[in-house]
């Protein structure tokens, strides 16, 4: 199991498009992927769960991966956050 705190740095936070990209990325891996914010833990493979976190810019999420490809999943998710979900701002 890997856990890391990841900041939300894109201007619009985890809005619908960013949530969809996150869910799509998480779903590409066999391992379990969870996000936690303010005590609420959700499955990152569920777009409704991800959007329920209402994570705006400046929020910090705990990302947890657990399973056979956990490191690859964590690397991909960290890159997605760092790249601002491809939004460039």
Spans of model-derived segments:
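C-terminal structural segments of small proteins and small subunits
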Residues: 56-89
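Compact, glycine-rich, soluble single-domain proteins
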Residues: 7-56, 88
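Intrinsic-disorder/low-complexity, polar/charged segments enriched in Ser/Thr/Lys/Arg/Asp/Glu/Gln
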Residues: 1-5, 60-62
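Detector for methionine-enriched segments
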Residues: 1, 48-52, 74
